């Protein structure tokens, strides 16, 4: 049996743990479902004014914003200035064509009537999507996007401040974990 001091054991263990938390996922193996804290998603955003800007602000500290697209560059100038390294586009199709291989997901906050097609195009490329409400305008569009999500394996979410808020997620976790007991009524 090795004669190691408690202090040396704790010091070595702490160093090993620190190494694991900063090791890239290629070393740890993403195939096992592990994503290293140093890994960031490369995100593109289509429609970056108003809610689009708010959505980008929610992830700008944790993810890489690599491409921005808006038809109104005068209105979008402030957001473009905030992310000088991000490539800028007028047309989302050109952005998808040029950046498709280097983005993991897309934030969509364009005019409502364009949500479904921009989302479908991203999903077809295998990109995860966060889209502002409404995601679609018809049952047909909803069914199409459901089939696309199933066939491509991408994750999609329709944004809604009330349902996408961090506080809402926290309360759901409390309920699911039984931390606040059985919920029988909510007013």
What does each of the following model-derived ranges do?
Residues 1-17:
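N-terminal secretory signal peptides and thylakoid transit peptides that target proteins
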Residues 106-107:
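N-terminal Rossmann-like NAD(P) cofactor-binding module of classical short-chain dehydrogenase/reductase
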Residues 13-83, 162-165:
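N-terminal Rossmann-like dinucleotide-binding module
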């Amino acid at each position: 049996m090795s004669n190691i001091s408690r202090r040396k054991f704790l010091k070595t263990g702490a160093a090993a743990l620190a190494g694991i938390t900063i090791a890239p996922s290629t070393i740890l193996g993403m195939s096992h479902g592990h994503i290293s804290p140093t890994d960031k998603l490369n995100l593109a955003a289509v429609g970056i004014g108003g809610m689009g800007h708010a959505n980008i602000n929610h992830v700008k500290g944790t993810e890489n914003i690599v491409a921005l697209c808006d038809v109104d560059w005068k209105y979008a100038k402030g957001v473009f200035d905030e992310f000088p390294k991000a490539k800028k586009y007028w047309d989302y199709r050109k952005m998808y064509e040029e950046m498709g291989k280097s983005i993991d997901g897309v934030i969509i906050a364009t005019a409502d009537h364009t949500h479904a097609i921009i989302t479908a195009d991203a999903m077809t490329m295998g990109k995860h999507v966060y889209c502002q409400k409404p995601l679609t305008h018809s049952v047909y569009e909803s069914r199409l996007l459901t089939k696309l999500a199933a066939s491509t394996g991408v994750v999609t979410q329709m944004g809604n401040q009330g349902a996408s808020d961090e506080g809402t997620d926290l309360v759901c976790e409390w309920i699911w974990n039984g931390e606040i007991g059985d919920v029988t009524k909510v007013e």
